[in-house]
Curated annotation (Swiss-Prot):
Species this chain originates from: Gossypium hirsutum
Complexes and interactors: NDH is composed of at least 16 different subunits, 5 of which are encoded in the nucleus.
Free-text function comment from the UniProt entry: NDH shuttles electrons from NAD(P)H:plastoquinone, via FMN and iron-sulfur (Fe-S) centers, to quinones in the photosynthetic chain and possibly in a chloroplast respiratory chain. The immediate electron acceptor for the enzyme in this species is believed to be plastoquinone. Couples the redox reaction to proton translocation, and thus conserves the redox energy in a proton gradient.
Protein name: NAD(P)H-quinone oxidoreductase subunit J, chloroplastic
Single GO molecular function: quinone binding
Keyword terms: Chloroplast, Membrane, NAD, NADP, Plastid, Plastoquinone, Quinone, Thylakoid, Translocase, Transport
Primary localisation category: plastid
NAD recorded as keyword: yes
Coiled-coil region: none
Catalytic activity field: a plastoquinone + NADH + (n+1) H(+)(in) = a plastoquinol + NAD(+) + n H(+)(out); a plastoquinone + NADPH + (n+1) H(+)(in) = a plastoquinol + NADP(+) + n H(+)(out)
Length: 158
């Protein structure tokens, strides 16, 4: 079953895959990494001008990595927001997804955290570097195949 946004995207020839609806009735769409930036700009112009959150997760050990965007469109009033969830999957061997920083500035720290924890490289992000872990940290702690080091260096909080 396709939702309103999916029907609109099909009508305008924009490639995507409908993943159905979540428990709150929010439509979920899958977009290919190579199509994501242009579709993000189109969604912004269409009225999805609020990025509620961006997160990422490891789908399965050795499998794909996912970057998830929750967008909101307020057209008819604050009490009737239209929401959509976008998922962009990337191979773990070279996880590259276009950054949407220039579309939604609020994605700045969120994309950096996804990079820091899962190693997803957000192309054209102006400051893509670690945000939680030290720059010297090796590996991506939230990947399911991550092997934690057997020691941790404790640093002073000065």
């Amino acid at each position: 079953m396709q939702g309103r946004l999916s029907v609109w995207l099909v009508k305008h020839g924009l490639v995507h895959r409908s993943l159905g609806f979540d428990y709150q009735g929010i439509e979920t769409l899958q977009i290919k990494p190579e199509d994501w930036h242009s579709i993000a700009v189109i969604l912004y112009v269409y009225g999805y001008n609020y990025l509620r959150s961006q997160c990422a997760y490891d789908v399965a050990p050795g499998g794909l990595l996912a970057s998830v965007y929750h967008l909101t469109r307020i057209e008819y009033g604050v009490d009737q927001p239209e929401e959509v969830c976008i998922k962009v999957f990337a191979p773990r061997s070279n996880p590259r997804i276009p950054s949407v920083f220039w579309v939604w500035k609020s994605s700045d720290f969120q994309e950096r955290e996804s990079y820091d924890m899962l190693g997803i490289s957000y192309e054209n992000h102006p400051r893509l570097k670690r945000i939680l872990m030290p720059e010297s940290w090796i590996g991506w702690p939230l990947r399911k195949d991550y092997i934690a080091p057997n020691f941790y260096e404790i640093q002073d909080a000065h």
